[in-house]
Amino acid sequence: MAGQEDPVQREIHQDWANREYIEIITSSIKKIADFLNSFDMSCRSRLATLNEKLTALERRIEYIEARVTKGETLT
């Protein structure tokens, strides 16, 4: 009887080891996904801020170019 339980016990232990391994991999994938989502949001926010600053600079340049073209003083 003990000889029949040994392979079963080994299978049970192997199954638990596999489940633990899968849990570790799943947890790691979730952490990576969370990091990537956070990184994406951070990059989008920074790019939006940069875009606003560039747009404001472009408007100022266009305004200054228009004044220079008309011969107005910039003071």
From Swiss-Prot:
GO molecular function, one term: protein-containing complex binding
Protein name: Protein BRICK1
A Gene Ontology BP annotation from the UniProt entry: regulation of actin polymerization or depolymerization
UniProt key word 4Fe-4S: no
Gene from which the chain derives: BRK1
Coiled-coil spans in chain: 41-72
Protein localization: Cytoplasm, Cytoskeleton
Residues with PTM N-acetylalanine: A2
Biological role: Involved in regulation of actin and microtubule organization. Part of a WAVE complex that activates the Arp2/3 complex. As component of the WAVE1 complex, required for BDNF-NTRK2 endocytic trafficking and signaling from early endosomes.
Homology family: Belongs to the BRK1 family.
One cellular component term from this protein's GO annotations in UniProt: cytosol
